Design a protein with these regions (language model features):
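C-terminal active-site-proximal or functional interface alpha/beta core segments in diverse enzymes
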Residues: 144-176
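Polar interaction faces of repeat-based domains
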Residues: 133, 137-147
Length: 176
């Protein structure tokens, strides 16, 4: 089982609960990908979050035989969820409400560029076509500044997108 985006709110509490449950030796392993968004707030900044992440896969207190943090991977969050209708949509919503950015755009760009430039595999929660377009545009910018052949950036969830966006994702090497 993979949990991209760990923790959701309380690193120590969630980890202790997970380790306690996994101590019962269920017939599966758990692989964790840290949340750059949550750790930004918990650690007081992007550099502090990344420094903490650098210790996760090698610190025994955070790993067990069946629980492991994946090295050099991070989950970032673009726009809101499908079911809550908080995705960012290019054409908006018919009832006039607006989607939400889960991470302010300037912070998201700072995070994506920092992890990109430090050779992380980046996973991005993105649902609406505007949220995904923002990620596509930033990956293009990152490729222009610091080109990578096999960056393996991956979009998760993919609520709404069109064929031209899919082609652009393919051309940029974005996984879906």
């Amino acid at each position: 089982i993979a949990e991209p985006g760990f923790p959701s709110s309380d690193f120590d509490g969630e980890l202790q609960l997970l380790l306690q449950e996994m101590g019962k030796n269920p017939p599966y392993d758990v692989y964790l990908i840290p949340s750059g968004t949550q750790l930004f707030g918990m650690k007081g900044g992007n550099k502090e979050a990344m420094s903490f992440m650098e210790t996760l896969d090698t610190t025994r207190a955070y790993n067990r035989s069946n629980v492991n943090f994946l090295p050099k991977q991070v989950k970032l969050f673009s726009d809101g969820a499908i079911y809550s209708q908080l995705m960012q949509m290019k054409d908006g919503y018919t009832d006039g409400h607006h989607g939400e950015w889960m991470t302010p755009l300037s912070l998201f760009e700072e995070q994506l560029m920092m992890y990109w430039n430090n050779d992380y595999k980046i996973h991005v929660h993105a649902n609406g076509d505007l949220g995904q377009q923002m990620v596509i545009d930033l990956v293009q910018k990152a490729q222009n500044i610091n080109p990578k052949q096999d960056h393996r950036l991956t979009l998760h969830h993919m609520g709404y997108f069109d064929k031209p966006m899919a082609e652009k994702m393919k051309n940029l090497g974005i996984g879906i």
